[in-house]
């Protein structure tokens, strides 16, 4: 597992599991990955997530969501925006709208991890972690 970019690793694992139509995937459990998974669950992109293991071996088991009998993934695209080599910040007036409001941007703010919609309502800006649609 990539120890330096846990969010990038998490998004890649979810993307790969979606392409392979897996029911679950495991990612390293950190406070940040738990917060991002919580936002994805609240927005309906994943079914659930739970923590397993102890200490260094803690993992988040994420249950993915599909629609129809052909099992089309709910998540079409997961795009990492702010990376360790190039951080992307946005103030409250310039928060991005993803696909005109169809998708979400996950923002790391001083009030915690939230969607672009919640950040706009709260009136805070922050680091743009990723886009999901």
Curated annotation (Swiss-Prot):
GO terms for biological process: translation. Disulfide bonds: none annotated. It comes from the Bacteria. The keyword Lipid metabolism does not apply. GO terms for cellular component: ribonucleoprotein complex; ribosome. InterPro entries: Ribosomal_uS8, Ribosomal_uS8_CS, Ribosomal_uS8_sf. Transmembrane segments: none annotated. The keyword Ribonucleoprotein applies. One of its GO terms (molecular function) is rRNA binding. Keywords: Ribonucleoprotein, Ribosomal protein, RNA-binding, rRNA-binding. It holds the Pfam family Ribosomal_S8. One of the primary rRNA binding proteins, it binds directly to 16S rRNA central domain where it helps coordinate assembly of the platform of the 30S subunit. Part of the 30S ribosomal subunit. Contacts proteins S5 and S12. Belongs to the universal ribosomal protein uS8 family. This is Small ribosomal subunit protein uS8. The gene is rpsH.
